[in-house]
UniProtKB/Swiss-Prot annotation:
GO terms for cellular component: cytosolic large ribosomal subunit. InterPro entries: Ribosomal_bL28 (IPR026569), Ribosomal_bL28/bL31-like_sf (IPR034704), Ribosomal_bL28_bact-type (IPR001383), Ribosomal_bL28_sf (IPR037147). Residues 1-20 are annotated as: Disordered. This is Large ribosomal subunit protein bL28. The gene is rpmB. Belongs to the bacterial ribosomal protein bL28 family. Pfam families: Ribosomal_L28 (PF00830). It comes from Stutzerimonas stutzeri (strain A1501). GO terms for biological process: translation. One of its GO terms (molecular function) is structural constituent of ribosome.
Amino acid sequence: MSRVCQVTGKGPVTGNNISHANNKTRRRFLPNLQHHRFWVESEKRFVRLRVSAKGMRVIDKRGIDVVLAELRARGEKV
């Protein structure tokens, strides 16, 4: 399973660990992904999504119905 938010599309990015001696080693910054069940009142069921913390805020702001419509328009099975 990929580490990508279903709502925002955020995925891992790369960067450096930097030591006190300023040595640089490559690392990955992973998104804060959570499996979360959202109640969809219009469908009378729960929908389980893998979303980042920002994705949850987007759903709170815009509503789960709007976000699900966009996911389905993109071709994601929900």
